[in-house]
Amino acid sequence: MSDSITNLRSPATTSPFDLTDERAYQCWREWKLSDYPGSAEDLIVSVANPCRLSPAEKHALLSRCQKANAAIYRISTGDFANKELVGSLGRQFGLARLDRNLRADEDSITSLKVVSGPGGTYYIPYTNRPLNWHTDGYYNMPDEQVRGVVLHCVSDAAEGGENVYLDHEIAYLLLRDENPEYLAALMQPDAMTIPANTEAGVEIRPAQSGPVFSVEPRTGSPHMRYTARTRSIAWKDDRNTRMAVGFLTELLAGESEFLIRYRLQPGEGIICNNILHKREAFTDDPAGGRTRLLYRARYYDRIHGTELNTIWSGVRPCSG
């Protein structure tokens, strides 16, 4: 995979995510699909010390995030259970504002593992059951959207636990190619509503309505909030929204060439701009020392250097 991003050039006043600007979109589309990673191996970067990346390591990780909104790092030695490496890695990419979600640890980084008892079996991430397609924090308030994520593997399960990823910009591209009206529907401010979260009769989070796709005003980059769950969501009841959701559901259930499948090994992790992902079911073997534990840090920040306004600069026409 090439580290170059110089093929993407257009006047700064245009946006490929403006549904009325077809030329800017086609220019961005050409760049996006050119040399796009075809497998998880294309996203992997070996690093010696995640707390102090070398310039070459940082560039390799960043270039993958610029193209695919994600990179996988691999550490060969060290203390994989050291939580500080998660925060330190994130800070080197401008990730600082942690989302202290409901089940986060005291340091706002979440230990994802099977939890027994109250709360554990209710929230699927803390079970060994499959976790359907979603972006993190899709239920958050508009000013607390999760834009960056670091997911670090301390130990893997005895069996299963594979993740599948899809770059949300690729999802945008495929939807727009199919029918721009699908995107217009999914960008409506009331396209998707998440019901209130109530525990023991107490509302701990109010209902949240918002778009599936939006464009960050500061960076010009697209953002996505989505869940494939059906019992925790209400879609706007209009034809284009239903058609768009149906197309997206079929895409995620299929075998698209853009789906990235990977089972994180101890010492590996993914840093991303909150791309679409799901998790397969898994089986732990505590007696054999194989218990799945991942650290998850969710940020209100986007990976610095991946902003559209940073990449989409200068004036250079697309080919043709």
Which sequence ranges carry the predicted segments?
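Active-site environment of non-heme Fe oxygenases that use a 2-His-1-carboxylate facial triad
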Residues: 2-55, 105-264, 269-270, 275-320
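Short, flexible, solvent-exposed loop/turn segments with mixed acidic/basic and small polar residues
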Residues: 34-36, 59-65
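Short, flexible turn/loop "capping" segments at secondary-structure junctions
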Residues: 63-67, 143-144
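N-terminal, charged low-complexity regulatory/assembly segments
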Residues: 68-77
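Short beta-alpha junction loops
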Residues: 77-79, 104-106
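Short, conserved charged micro-motifs
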Residues: 80-85
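A short alpha->loop->secondary-structure connector
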Residues: 90-99
